[in-house]
Amino acid sequence: MPGQYAQSWLDWEAQSGGRSVLHGTPDEIKAMYAGLSQALKPMAPPFSENVDVTEGDVDGIKYRIYKLKGERGPLPIAFNTHGGGWMVGDLDTDHLLCGVIAEHTKSVVVNVDYRLTPDVAYPVPLEDSLKVYKWAAANASSFGGDPDKFYTIGGSAGGALALQIANKIKKDPQLKDGLKGVVALVPATTHWEAVPEKYKSKYKAVEDNKTGVPIIDGESMEIFFKYAKVDPSDPDTFTLLAEDNHKNFPPTYFASCEFDPLRDDAYVMEAALKEAGVPTKHDHYPGMPHYFWLIPTVPESKIFVENLLQGIGWILSQMKGATRSSYI
């Protein structure tokens, strides 16, 4: 059973006027998210002056590219998909984090603005992301990227996408060898209606955190899944079910949080990949809720970023011809 919230989180809630959980209609959730984003802006650190940002689109799907000034490349390519339940979020969601990754791991970061529910349903967010990924692979030299050193990265719904993209790309004869890693932060990997029997005893978080935990709870996930119109038994959406392809996944870094309905999604996916012989690394954050690093003033957010950079360093160190010290 879950333990106690970190005091730093409780202090933040007290300062900010109480606990926020994303519930309601899509319009209500979008309004709550916009309000939270505005409230957090004054707390955010400035964007690095050492990173150049360019923008473009692929058939109307917008992207941003982040690159450390003075780096000619070719550099590893971090392909980022933002979180938000496939319902909220945009290129600004992970803007600061993309800059940090570009500056401190010497990766060129491609950040994707896939379309959102309820205007579209699944698999459109995945299809949009794959379209930009394939463009990036074909045009890597134009932005200093190395098409043989891709890794996907994302949090929550974006973490699900990072794994979904990997599952798809590892089946593509032309692209499969270029994908070398996955960074899956508090990802959705299975649906509670279709958890494989061998993992059911380990999959308790959605009940432990069904109501009242911060940011999202189990009821929030019901809303996100409803409007995404996901099929609980689809392995292209829920990659825990893509068992035949697990052995082909690249090294994967996970992060999970205690008070999170998706906590065990990371644990069961890691167990499945380990069983298939895939190297994994996992940082868990006791006492913290889903996606807590959104709040920059919570001390654990700095620890999260430090661990994330180490996790990316671990991914990069396993790429052919690389050493960890080459990147961080």
Swiss-Prot record:
Task: Work out whether the entry's keyword set contains Hydrolase.
Answer: yes
Q: Fetch the InterPro entries from UniProt.
A: AB_hydrolase_3, AB_hydrolase_fold, GDXG_lipolytic_enzyme
What are the inducing conditions? Expression is positively regulated by the dothistromin-specific transcription factor aflR.
Question: What's the source species for this entry?
Answer: Dothistroma septosporum (strain NZE10 / CBS 128990)
The kind of enzyme this is, by top-level EC class, is hydrolase
User: Which Pfam family is one of this chain's hits?
Assistant: Abhydrolase_3
Query: Its function?
Result: Versiconal hemiacetal acetate esterase; part of the fragmented gene cluster that mediates the biosynthesis of dothistromin (DOTH), a polyketide toxin very similar in structure to the aflatoxin precursor, versicolorin B. The first step of the pathway is the conversion of acetate to norsolorinic acid (NOR) and requires the fatty acid synthase subunits hexA and hexB, as well as the polyketide synthase pksA. PksA combines a hexanoyl starter unit and 7 malonyl-CoA extender units to synthesize the precursor NOR.
From the record, which residues define motif Involved in the stabilization of the negatively charged intermediate by the formation of the oxyanion hole?
Answer: 82-84
Source domain of life is Eukaryota
Q: One GO molecular function term?
A: versiconal hemiacetal acetate esterase activity
- The protein's name in its UniProt record: Versiconal hemiacetal acetate esterase
Biochemical pathway: Mycotoxin biosynthesis
Which Gene3D superfamilies does the protein's record reference? alpha/beta hydrolase (3.40.50.1820)
Which keywords label this protein?
Hydrolase
Name the EC number(s).
3.1.1.94
Output the lineage of the source organism: Eukaryota, Fungi, Dikarya, Ascomycota, Pezizomycotina
Q: Give the reactions, separated by semicolons, that this protein catalyses.
A: (2S,3S)-versiconal hemiacetal acetate + H2O = (2S-3S)-versiconal hemiacetal + acetate + H(+); (3S)-versiconol acetate + H2O = (S)-versiconol + acetate + H(+)
